[in-house]
Amino acid sequence: MTPFELLKTACHAACRQTPACAPSYRAMLKTENISQMMAVWREYWEDISGGKYADIINDRLPAAYPTLRKEMNAAGIYVNECPKMAPEFVRVLVTDCDRIVDIHDYAKCYILGNAIVYAWDHSQVYSERSDKAIIALNDHAYGYVSKGWVIAVNAAQLWTAADAVLNGSVTCEAHGGTVKAYAYRKLEASGDTQVYAASERNITLDGNATIHPLVKED
């Protein structure tokens, strides 16, 4: 079975695990080559990065990627790697990975598994599936982190519902978890967020969010 056939088999598996086979899976089953498959992935990206298919991709794609890499990269889709020059067209899927994955330029990264991701330049990172994901936002990077742990520095922007550390001219919108704010530009906290900061300057609390003194041990 070729790597492309393995991906189509994964589509069958995803269909069997959903009450009604999603249009995206049916479209993937009709594809005849990896170029067509990548076009369907882009059209139905939410299913690829957030649906049941994401779990199957996390398990099966890394083994098939070396063979499919050239064609996938031609479509602007990468797995556990990112080119230094990466326009907004570039999308990176990060699966379970035992090395740091650097995201550059304007690429958009979607974390599916347990991994460490460093975001640079104006890149974007989305982490909504793995509690063990670790994300570092540098430069002007943006992060949407509902699962995992994140540190934001420089002029990064962060939306988070997970535990986070801020240490720079960072803008943060927190909707849960614990936020340790060593340095920041603006912090808005809501839900049950617990904020640890040296002062309340430029911090807005809503809902049940609370603020506590930031001490050296933190």
Region roles according to the model:
Residues M1-D218:
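Short, glycine-biased loop/turn motifs at secondary-structure junctions and
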